[in-house]
Amino acid sequence: MGSETITQGFKRAPHRSLLYALGLDEKELEKPIIGIASSYSEIIPGHKHLDKIAEAVKYGVYSAGGTPVIFSTIGVCDGIAMGHSGMKYSLASREIIADSVETVVRAHQFDGLVLVPNCDKIVPGMLMAAARLDIPAIVVSGGPMLAGDYQGKSLDLHNVFEAVGEVKAGKITEGELENIEKAACPGCGSCAGMFTANSMNCLTEVLGMALPGNGTIPAVYAERIRLAKKSGRQIINLVEKNIKPSDIMTREAFKNAICVDMALGCSTNTALHLPAIAHEAGLDLELDLFNDISRKVPHICSLTPAGIYHIEDLYRVGGIPAVMKELSEKDLIQLDQLTVTGDTVGTNISRVGYIDHKIIRPVSNPYHNQGGLAVLKGNIAPGGSVVKQAAVADSMMVHRGPARVFKGEEEAVDAIINGQISEGDVVVITYEGPRGGPGMREMLTPTSALAGLGLDDKVALITDGRFSGATRGAAIGHVSPEAASGGPIGIIQDGDIIEIDIPAKSLNVDISEEEFEKRMSNFNPELPDISGYLGRYAKHVSSASTGAVLE
């Protein structure tokens, strides 16, 4: 065991002395020492209850014969960080989380690891650490928030963002907005739709790194506590059998994750995080693979913001195992992949009985014949760009319109709110990429403003930044290379005609080849003048097309 490095032999007497200072005894030092990485926080609604989840994990570890120790990581609430300079730190925090978990585990020689995340960047950050460390590990997340209710209508955080635009459009009053904001988020948990946090929690389950139910059991249900206890017990089995993340997170497991990603219509951020996790596992998850799988896998669950259902609705009809079972009927899932249950995917989903086809449509009758995400390429995005096609209006799947170019989110939001954007326009936001932002901010505020004004099916938006999972509309992000790295998005000018063809997977600016080359040769990219962590991040971060990992 790794912990024997700090517990065994006379030379380790000083180490044992410090462990005794924790209240541990001789018997506890003979057992596997399990690190519990908790991202409990009083500023993140999705993490407010993780102290209770971590304690339940601790109980499970004890009951199975292990010695649990809890340690902490940081986290950022993307919703609170949205729309201001704080969002520059969100994606960048993913790397800090991965590094911090690695640091604590290696420094203290744990035998196994239970990861307790919940929200957007914490889940992938912890999975990156698990892949990097490659010791027995299991994830148990905090679970989704329940949907709110206002005047008999279910709602969630994305409704609040869009309501801001509705106030500006005169559709609702500020008093109504206040009522909506107080009703949308009724308690702890990750925001209730198929946004980034829930997307990643569901895909963690698909990858095999979490027990069935991890993605959909609501945060406030007692079943979530039982899942945490069970996860604590299961890590001891994984340690005893030496089942490691490298045994579970194989290329085929990632293909399963992308398959379910497409079926659910998950956040575009999955196209950043899955490649980043795979990178830590020594695997290359190219963007083209997302398109290859999307062409084969239909979109069978329409959850908010694309549809009307919430994660709790998916939970009630069997959750992720039921989705995988439905997909397996058409041989779209690799069933022989090992999971943290100790069983294969096939064994896990064999327990699924009746599937409610109101929430989970049959593969033969999907919402869309192709998956939820699409990767677009062209002269604007030779390295690729990503759109949640499941949340794009039919009228915007093919669009041609004049560019309205803005350097940074704030300029674009001001123009949208002040009525300077017309039907048919293509809003282009530059210098928001991983390096140019830096930090690749989410553009939820401008897309929500467009939706609130009733323009989400009339105006497109493209950017080298990214989008919240709560975004809907013709929002194309992750344009690579980014402007700060000399990408062609940086040469687009006001009035240029932008051609978007999502079915054809293309994104282009309609200018002559000679004009294109002239602009590129005269292009001098701007780099951010920033110090501190973001300054270091900007120097080392890779392209969005490779997961925005640090090089």
UniProtKB/Swiss-Prot annotation:
Keyword check for Lyase, yes or no: yes
Concerning InterPro entries, the annotation shows: Dihydro-acid_dehy_C, DihydroxyA_deHydtase, DiOHA_6PGluconate_deHydtase_CS, ILV_EDD_C, ILV_EDD_N, IlvD/EDD_N
Which PROSITE patterns does this one have? ILVD_EDD_1 (PS00886), ILVD_EDD_2 (PS00887)
Give the matching SUPFAM superfamilies. IlvD/EDD N-terminal domain-like, LeuD/IlvD-like
Kindly tell me the pathway this chain contributes to: Amino-acid biosynthesis; L-isoleucine biosynthesis; L-isoleucine from 2-oxobutanoate: step 3/4; Amino-acid biosynthesis; L-valine biosynthesis; L-valine from pyruvate: step 3/4
Cofactors named for this entry: [2Fe-2S] cluster; Mg(2+)
Q: Which Enzyme Commission number(s) are listed? A: 4.2.1.9
- Which purpose does this protein serve, as stated in its record? Functions in the biosynthesis of branched-chain amino acids. Catalyzes the dehydration of (2R,3R)-2,3-dihydroxy-3-methylpentanoate (2,3-dihydroxy-3-methylvalerate) into 2-oxo-3-methylpentanoate (2-oxo-3-methylvalerate) and of (2R)-2,3-dihydroxy-3-methylbutanoate (2,3-dihydroxyisovalerate) into 2-oxo-3-methylbutanoate (2-oxoisovalerate), the penultimate precursor to L-isoleucine and L-valine, respectively.
- What quaternary arrangement does the UniProt entry report? Homodimer.
Family named by the database record: Belongs to the IlvD/Edd family.
| Name of the protein in question | Dihydroxy-acid dehydratase
Query: Whose protein is this, by species?
Result: Halothermothrix orenii (strain H 168 / OCM 544 / DSM 9562)
